[in-house]
Amino acid sequence: MTQQLQTLIDNAWDNRASLSPSAAPKEVVDAVEHVIAELNNGRLRVATREGVGQWTVHQWIKKAVLLSFRLKDNELMKAGDLGFFDKVPTKFAHLSADEMAATGVRVVPPAVARRGSFIAKGAILMPSYVNIGAYVDEGTMVDTWATVGSCAQVGKNVHLSGGVGLGGVLEPLQANPTIIEDNCFIGARSEVVEGVIVEENSVISMGVYIGQSTPIYDRTTGETTYGRVPAGSVVVSGNLPKDGGRYSMYAAIIVKKVDAKTRSTTSLNDLLRD
């Protein structure tokens, strides 16, 4: 079934220029809708973890997300007295109180999660935004004004502090999703984008910006890497000298490995998750 679905989506993607809401084969429309529904309930996800820092990205699922925009017209949506005009409904719009309770998720107004995202049991959405295709795992808090971009993957017991931004894959088009692994703490107003992977148990200080071109410098080893924060790292914003010291350029600096002191200041509050 999955292989047939993947083949159908891949073929539709190759012929996407010919697709529109009024001109698309029913089997393509049904296939895309099936993928979005499976993403919404967590049975499919854009990327699956194979080990620490090792992920397999399912490009065909990302293609289905993109095709869903091609196959739908905008429509009027209401939230109380507010009106919206979009192609993607919100995730919880039509759930009853019992159905919401069964999800095990706490949603603080005016948090928004789009249909096609998955929010696992025990997660908390403060007034924040979770885009289509994203996966937020158990016990994670998405704090106020944080944004989880399209298809981003967030692990268990993660804290995304106020104003954090995780980049999406839809625009500009990115090959791989941004990934935050289990037990990470991302400090206020930090941005992780362009498919960067923050490996498990890491702490990103406030105001750190990491993309694929950002040097990640380990002050202990002197090594500079790109696109990946090693497991258990404590990262702050800094600068590295360039051109013999004539000027400096922004870098993310690994200052140490996570220790007991770090954990005591970034631990999750179980009282908020009852």
From Swiss-Prot:
Keyword Repeat among record annotations: yes
Domain of life: Bacteria
GO cellular component: cytoplasm
GO biological process entries: diaminopimelate biosynthetic process; lysine biosynthetic process via diaminopimelate
Molecular functions per Gene Ontology: 2,3,4,5-tetrahydropyridine-2,6-dicarboxylate N-succinyltransferase activity; nucleotidyltransferase activity
Protein keywords: Acyltransferase, Amino-acid biosynthesis, Cytoplasm, Diaminopimelate biosynthesis, Lysine biosynthesis, Repeat, Transferase
SUPFAM superfamilies the record matches: Trimeric LpxA-like enzymes
Gene3D superfamilies per UniProt: Hexapeptide repeat proteins, Tetrahydrodipicolinate-N-succinyltransferase, N-terminal domain
Compartments it resides in: Cytoplasm
InterPro entries: DapD_Trfase_Hexpep_rpt_fam, Hexapep, Hexapep_transf_CS, THP_succinylTrfase_dom1, THP_succinylTrfase_N_sf, Trimer_LpxA-like_sf
Biological pathway: Amino-acid biosynthesis; L-lysine biosynthesis via DAP pathway; LL-2,6-diaminopimelate from (S)-tetrahydrodipicolinate (succinylase route): step 1/3
Reactions that this protein is recorded to catalyse: (S)-2,3,4,5-tetrahydrodipicolinate + succinyl-CoA + H2O = (S)-2-succinylamino-6-oxoheptanedioate + CoA
EC number, as in UniProt: 2.3.1.117
S-S pairs: none
Residues the record lists as binding substrate: 106, 143
Subunit structure and binding partners: Homotrimer.
Family: Belongs to the transferase hexapeptide repeat family.
Name under which the protein is recorded: 2,3,4,5-tetrahydropyridine-2,6-dicarboxylate N-succinyltransferase
Gene: dapD
